[in-house]
């Protein structure tokens, strides 16, 4: 997919809003005209709602609106210059915190604490070494941890036009069959109706509106420059298979940390696809199915897309650790039962034993522990770097966010299997034997931190029949800046949806989130107990017992629910 071509570590949207001058140009806000629910097939919606950005959004934009120089740190991870993340000890007074900042970097400014954060952001000279400044803060007695704002990205496999082609839908949802979901739905027909799943990602196509935007000149994530297109009215529609007639109430506490609004619209398609796997409407006679099709969905946008950049909401594509941490904490504080993180970043392999080294993500680990402490089950994609050789970390680098799960009971990291695992049961295992093939997806990162496996798909053995399919935007109308998709650059359309095939551990993680929602619906609400059940009752793939490719095995929805004594 374009969204992760090259799997660059690209950071979070920091808002540029009304009235700000950036690089000598006045940025324009995103205005939503005619906002409404439910989905597009429910008829026209009166043009009556305008939502310009708030003064708080503009204030934050002023903090972050500088050019976004990217640095590759000594620890190997890319980070954004000009700021550091600092967690002061609770006992430290405000005066002591300000004194610590002055001591470490005379020109540093501790910014006002933002919502959903227990840490501070200190702005520094963009020319300063952010990792060196963070190390100096870590040496202070008032500080719990400090780090550079390392970059993260969606865990989707690199670009191939075929990944997103959808003129027909011949393969069926082999991925749901693999999890024994038909039997699981018989056991738990409510399929998570009392459970809220937060998808911390690129947003969600959950409303009908018109985007009133000015498209400026921008550089996409591959480094290609595109000219300004000026003022545009762009149609936007809800994914009818996620928010259909009578289902608007399933969207709970949406929030956008890119634009700092409560309307986290997806301009990429990744977050919508992931949300569909978790909870796409089922038993409605059309389209595809989701795992826990009655769940409530909480879209939390923390990753910017190319169009977020073009619309003036972010100077870059992707996200940073501090924004992911805020998204996790927001979800935990606003009623999420399960948090899905289909995102990641390669980094050091030993953050568990050496958490203060450059390249680790203590701010995200703190947020995950906070969420689990509030009885949220956290699911993290294991990463897509099995065949990647990182210049600092070598072949198959560790996904530092997924690695956190291995030391937090109640959080799990999820590797991907491909369609070859379909039908594997009991003693039959995926091995190197050609009659019992290795069904680990070729791209799926592996290591001691992998705990579970789920369908992520693959194009190598099955072509398009090996993808994971859900409803999301038709890329033909959204990726208008990509000459491999459309020959002429122009404004996008977000009102045309299709059944689209993706592959990646981004796709594997939401299968586990959906099964966990069904377990919670059944009464297992302790995150550590959910993890234990999923691991104990999974289908053992590979060598007997836990291994670095499959973890404890393939999630088996029927076996997990039957483990509660419900025999169907």
Regions found by a protein language model. Give the residues of each.
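Bacterial N-terminal signal peptides
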Residues: 10-18
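Primarily auto-inhibitory N-terminal propeptides
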Residues: 20-167, 185-187
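Acidic glycine-/aspartate-rich tracts in secreted/extracellular proteins
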Residues: 90-93, 152, 202-206, 210, ...
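A cross-family glycoside hydrolase active-site/sugar-binding cleft signature
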Residues: 149, 301, 340-344, 381-382, ...
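Active-site core segment of subtilase-fold serine proteases
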Residues: 160-319, 323-360, 369, 388-390, ...
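Active-site glycine-centered loops adjacent to acidic/histidine catalytic or metal-binding residues
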Residues: 201, 383, 504
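C-terminal subdomain of the subtilisin-like protease fold in secreted/lumenal serine endopeptidases
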Residues: 329, 334-342, 410-413, 498, ...
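Extracellular S/T/G-rich loop segment that most often corresponds to the catalytic His/Ser-adjacent loop
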Residues: 376, 402-518
């Amino acid at each position: 997919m374009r969204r992760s071509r090259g799997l660059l570590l690209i950071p979070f949207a920091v808002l540029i809003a009304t009235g700000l001058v950036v690089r000598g140009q006045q940025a324009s806000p995103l205005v939503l005209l005619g906002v409404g629910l439910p989905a597009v097939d429910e008829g026209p919606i009166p043009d009556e709602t305008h939502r310009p950005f708030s003064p708080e959004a503009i204030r934050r934009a002023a903090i972050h609106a500088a050019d976004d120089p990217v640095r590759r740190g000594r620890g190997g991870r890319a980070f954004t210059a000009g700021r550091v993340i600092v967690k002061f000890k609770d006992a430290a007074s405000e005066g002591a915190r300000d004194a610590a900042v002055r001591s470490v970097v005379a020109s540093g400014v501790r910014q006002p604490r933002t919502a959903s954060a227990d840490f501070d952001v200190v702005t520094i000279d963009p020319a300063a070494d952010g990792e060196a400044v963070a190390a100096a803060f870590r040496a202070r007695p008032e500080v719990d941890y400090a780090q550079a704002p390392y970059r993260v990205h969606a865990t989707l496999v690199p670009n191939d036009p075929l990944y997103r082609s959808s003129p027909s839908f011949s393969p069926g949802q082999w991925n749901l069959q693999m999890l024994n979901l038909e039997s699981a739905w018989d056991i738990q027909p409510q399929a998570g109706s009392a459970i809220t799943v937060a998808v911390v990602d690129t947003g969600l196509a959950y409303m009908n509106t018109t985007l009133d935007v000015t498209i400026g000149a921008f550089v996409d994530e591959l480094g290609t420059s595109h000219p300004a297109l000026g003022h545009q009215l762009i149609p936007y529609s809800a994914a009818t298979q996620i928010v259909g007639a009578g289902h608007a109430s399933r969207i709970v506490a949406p929030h956008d940390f890119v634009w700092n609004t409560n309307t986290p619209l997806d301009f990429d398609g990744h977050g919508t696809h992931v949300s569909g796997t978790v909870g796409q409407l089922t038993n409605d006679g059309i389209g595809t199915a989701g795992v826990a099709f009655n769940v409530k969905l909480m879209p939390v946008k923390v990753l910017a897309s190319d169009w977020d950049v073009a619309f003036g909401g972010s100077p870059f594509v992707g996200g940073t650790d501090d924004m992911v941490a805020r998204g996790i904490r927001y979800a935990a504080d606003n009623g999420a039962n399960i948090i899905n993180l289909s995102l990641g970043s390669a980094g050091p392999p030993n953050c568990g034993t050496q958490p203060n080294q450059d390249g680790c993500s203590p701010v995200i680990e703190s947020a995950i522990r906070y969420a689990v402490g509030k009885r949220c089950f956290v699911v993290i994609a294991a990463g897509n770097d099995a065949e990647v050789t990182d210049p600092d970390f070598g072949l198959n680098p560790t996904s530092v966010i997924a690695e956190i799960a291995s030391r937090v009971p109640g959080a799990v990291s999820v590797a991907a299997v491909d369609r070859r695992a379909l039908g594997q049961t009991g003693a039959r295992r995926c091995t190197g034997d050609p009659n019992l093939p290795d069904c680990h997806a070729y791209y799926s990162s592996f290591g001691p931190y992998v705990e579970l496996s789920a369908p992520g798909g693959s194009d190598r053995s099955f072509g398009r029949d090996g993808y994971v399919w859900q409803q999301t935007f038709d890329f033909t109308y959204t990726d208008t800046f990509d000459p491999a998709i459309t020959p002429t650059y122009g404004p996008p359309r977000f009102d045309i949806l299709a059944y689209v095939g993706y592959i990646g551990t981004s796709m594997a993680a939401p299968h586990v989130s959906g099964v966990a929602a069904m377990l919670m619906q059944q009464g297992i609400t302790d995150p550590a107990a959910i993890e234990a059940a999923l691991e104990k009752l999974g289908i053992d793939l590979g060598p007997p017992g836990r291994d670095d490719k499959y973890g404890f095995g393939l999630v088996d929805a029927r076996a997990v629910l039957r483990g509660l004594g419900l025999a169907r």
